[in-house]
Amino acid sequence: MTKIAHASIDEHGKIAGGKAGDQTGKEVCIRSYYANWNVVIRMKLPEMRQKVAECMVKAANNAAIGYDQSQRNTLLNYSRNFGYDPSKVTMPCETDCSALVTLACLYAGIQEKSLVVGGNSATTSTLRKRLQATGAVDVFTSKDYTMSDSKLLVGDILIREGHHTAVVVETSNKVATKPIEAVAKEVCNGLWGTGENRRKRLTDAGYDYKAVQAKVNEILKGK
C-alpha cells in the first residue's frame, strides 16, 4: 500500500485561525495515497529522496507542528537552527502543505535560497519551477505518474498545482538500489535496451537516466 504524508487542514477544518500545534493529530499526518495530482517531482539522488520522506514522517509525528496558512513559515523559522529537522522542534508552530514540502527539500540538501524568497516558502504554484531550477530533480506529468501510484517511489513529491502537495513515504514499488556504475555496465551489455526505451526503463526503475548515460559514456571512452 502506498502512503503519503502532508500538511492537511487545521483543527476546525479551515486553512487558518487555529491554535499552533497539531490539535487533532491530523493537521499534519500520514494517510493512504489518492490520485489527484498533475505533477510528480523526484529527486535524482536516491539519498535525497529518502531524506525528503524522512522529514515528512518526522513532521507528521511531531504534535508541535500544526496547520495554518497565515503562519506557514513558523516551522521553517524554528527548525532552521536544527538543520531543518522537524523532529527537534518543540515550540508549537505552523506550516501548510507546500511550506512543509519546502522544508523537506531543504532537509534533503536543497539550498534555502532556491526555494524560500523574501522569507516565504515556495507554494504549490511555484514549487515545480523552483525545484527544476536547482537541477536536482526529474519532473513527470504523464497520467501513469500523476493518476496512479504504480510508478511512484518513496520521496516522490506529488503536486496539484494551485491546490495541494504531499510526499510518498511508503510504497511497495521497486526502488533503485544498484550503484550507477553497476547499472551503466548493464547498459553497456545491452540489458536496458536502447534509445527512448532505455530512458523509460531506467527512469521507471528510479534511476537518473542522465547520470547513468554519463557513466556509460565514461566506460565506453575508457575501452
What are these regions (language model features)?
Residues V154-D156:
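Loop/turn positions that initiate beta-strands
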Residues C188-R199, Y207-Y209:
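Extracytoplasmic Gram-positive cell-surface binding/anchoring modules and repeats
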Residues D138-S148:
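Short alpha-helix capping/helix-loop boundary micro-motifs
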Residues T171-A182, K221-K223:
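Low-complexity, Pro/Thr/Ser/Gly/Ala-rich linker/spacer regions in secreted
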Residues T165-T171:
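Short beta-strand-centered aromatic/proline hotspots
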Residues M1-V116, E161-H163, K174:
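N-terminal capping segments
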Residues A205-K223:
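Repeat-associated, polar segments at repeat-unit boundaries in modular proteins
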